[in-house]
């Protein structure tokens, strides 16, 4: 049975580059794994949490507070996964380190 009451969690974007293409892609890929309807809210603006372009349009920079809302049978599990992804900064530090290693090959 689908829950009709939305679950809501608030997160702060922590990665230095904010929600640019790579983290938004990760967010959407994660969101698409769930049946629940997922939305992001920034300063009252609500967008589809499964749309790369809609999320990019929010322009969420480092320090931005976002509400993640999910409604559906797997809403709580979806929120746990998405909140963890945002709180871990989309593992951006690992990517930066890998780019440094990769760039050194061309020196």
Specify the residue positions occupied by each region the protein language model found.
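N-terminal first-folded block
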Residues: 3-39
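Glycine-rich, flexible loop/turn motifs
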Residues: 9, 15, 43, 54, ...
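C-terminal structural segments of small proteins and small subunits
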Residues: 71-100
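N-terminal loops that bind phosphate or other acidic moieties
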Residues: 3-9, 52, 96-107
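Amphipathic, hydrophobic secondary-structure cores in small proteins
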Residues: 21, 29, 34-81
């Amino acid at each position: 049975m689908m829950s009709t009451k939305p679950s809501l969690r608030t997160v702060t974007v922590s990665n230095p580059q904010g929600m640019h293409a790579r983290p938004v892609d990760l967010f959407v890929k994660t969101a698409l794994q769930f049946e629940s309807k997922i939305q992001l809210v920034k300063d009252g603006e609500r967008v589809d949490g499964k749309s790369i372009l809609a999320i990019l349009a929010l322009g969420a920079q480092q320090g931005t507070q976002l509400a993640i809302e999910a409604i559906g049978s797997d809403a709580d599990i979806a929120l746990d996964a998405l909140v963890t992804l945002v709180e871990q900064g989309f593992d951006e530090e690992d990517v930066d380190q890998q780019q440094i290693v990769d760039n050194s090959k061309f020196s």
